[in-house]
Amino acid sequence: MKIIGFLFYLLFVLCFCAGAQTVIPLYEGAIPGEKQHENKEYDDNGIYSFVSKPDLTIYLPEVDSKVKTAVVICPGGGYHVVCASYEGHKIAKEMNKKGVAAFVLKYRLPNDNTCENKSIAPLQDAQRAIKVVRDNAEKWGIDPNQIGIMGFSAGGHLAATAGTHFSKSYIENKEGTSLRPDFMMLVYPVISMQPELTHGGSRDNLLGKNASSELLELFSNEKQVTEKTPRTFLTHAQDDDVVSVENSLRFYEALKAKNVSADMHLFSKGKHGYPLEPAASNWLGDVFKWMKEQELVD
């Protein structure tokens, strides 16, 4: 166990010194709630299927960067795949250009064959990612109070879940590290698990087709907002025919009802998947404008 811990630490040090992209396993030892299984993960040009061994790809900006902000990025994929290429790595590189440290999370996909409780496995991974970044903030030149989370589509649901369920630790956290993201940036997110709002595939993959009303309520993040929910940036296209814009609208309303700082940018056209749609090509500029207003970038 000591050897495993040392190797994990060594990976951190090498990553920090090199200032370059490095992939590390998300957990030092056992993965929480993991069932014994054959690893069937498949990579199709950055779109991952059957993910059961989560990892974190670390993108650090130039070491002389004055910006001390970090973002954990949760790609989308309907909790069926992880679209890490255009909703992860490409975004991380853009964050680096602004001096922001970025961490692309390849989280576990809910699967009864690999997880004891598949509904919490992605949340465990998101909490662990926040903990890893915060525990190593000094080493990586990050302000521990400027660690946010960003998510796309179902990854937006995961990010919003991390931002509304942080008071309960679903992972081992002996150090008592805060699992609360300091801000959220949600891009065409799935927010709700309620039948009239949700993306059916995301709901069924995460919670199952016969989820109880209590479970649907728990993972409907518009119903979990409190005064302590982090400040939030939302963006969505009104013609999104995959994830209804009502998800973002309801979350924005819930945030404002609790006096949480929130900014929402809507596009009349853009469909689902901004990184591939020229109609909504300014969305990332809106993100950085908001980050500047929040004093997260220069």
Where do the language-model regions lie?
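N-terminal cap/lid segment of alpha/beta-hydrolase-fold proteins
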Residues: 21-65
